[in-house]
């Protein structure tokens, strides 16, 4: 199962069809285990996109919650959260991700968690800045005078007005998540075989560039 249709099983092996060249039967050929490369590319795209979506969903949600509270209320909590985000940003992203993965282990869930943690600070800063800008706007002051509760002000009156800015950062984050997941899987610390990922497929195929170049070119 996945986001895209696959004509063959992505894990079924066939010694008789090992390194079959591209044909009408196998559009992108087969790999060293006789698996259909087209099916695995489709599955790899599905895996990478799904992981990237969940990374952005997790980090974006946490970024909204932390950024909204710290940006609106300020104070000690704001200071603590900002110092934590500064500390996270102080480490190279790939290094911090490697540390988290080394503690948690490889696998889809841990990749999502590791990348999600690394991506949170960027969303916190964007949301915090927008909430700080809007918390003293005239319409927010009028809402307070009318007795509107803080939670409603945060998530009904302010949050919808930052989505134009937040959406742009989400798109950038999604692209970065795709690159990060592919890089991690290529290095062998992301999605584990036999699950297909664009990164681990490229890593497996590079050794056959001379004998079966379609494995890499696909």
What residue ranges belong to the model's regions?
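Transmembrane alpha-helix signature in integral membrane proteins
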Residues: 37-72
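Generic hydrophobic transmembrane alpha-helix motif, especially the helices
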Residues: 27, 31, 62, 71-72, ...
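Loop-to-helix entry region at the N-terminal start of transmembrane alpha-helices
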Residues: 38-52, 102-122, 214-218
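Hydrophobic alpha-helical transmembrane segments of membrane transport/permease proteins
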Residues: 1-33, 187-196
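Alpha-helical membrane-interface segments at transmembrane helix boundaries
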Residues: 38-46, 50, 78-89, 105, ...
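Glycine-rich helix-loop "coupling/hinge" segments at transmembrane-helix boundaries
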Residues: 101-103, 130-131, 179-218
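Transmembrane alpha-helix boundary and packing residues in multipass membrane permease domains
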Residues: 68, 97-102, 111, 115, ...
């Amino acid at each position: 199962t996945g986001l895209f249709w696959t004509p063959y099983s992505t894990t079924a092996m066939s010694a008789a069809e090992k390194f079959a060249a591209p044909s009408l039967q196998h559009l992108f050929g087969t790999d060293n285990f006789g698996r259909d490369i087209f099916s695995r590319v489709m599955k790899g795209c599905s895996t990478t996109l799904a992981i990237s979506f969940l990374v952005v969903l997790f980090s974006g949600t946490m970024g909204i919650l932390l950024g909204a509270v710290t940006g609106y209320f300020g104070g000690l909590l704001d200071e603590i959260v900002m110092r934590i985000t500064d500390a996270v940003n102080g480490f190279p992203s790939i290094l911090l991700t490697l540390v988290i993965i080394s503690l948690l282990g490889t696998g889809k869930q841990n990749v999502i968690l590791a990348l999600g943690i690394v991506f949170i600070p960027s969303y916190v800063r964007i949301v915090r800045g927008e909430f700080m800008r809007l918390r003293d706007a005239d319409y927010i002051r009028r809402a307070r005078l009318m007795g509107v509760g803080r939670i409603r002000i945060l998530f009904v009156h302010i949050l919808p007005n930052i989505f134009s800015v937040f959406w742009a950062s989400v798109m950038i984050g999604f692209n970065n998540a795709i690159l990060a997941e592919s890089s991690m899987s290529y290095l062998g610390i992301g999605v584990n075989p036999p699950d297909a990922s664009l990164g681990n497929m490229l890593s497996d195929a590079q050794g056959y560039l001379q004998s079966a170049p379609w494995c890499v070119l696909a």
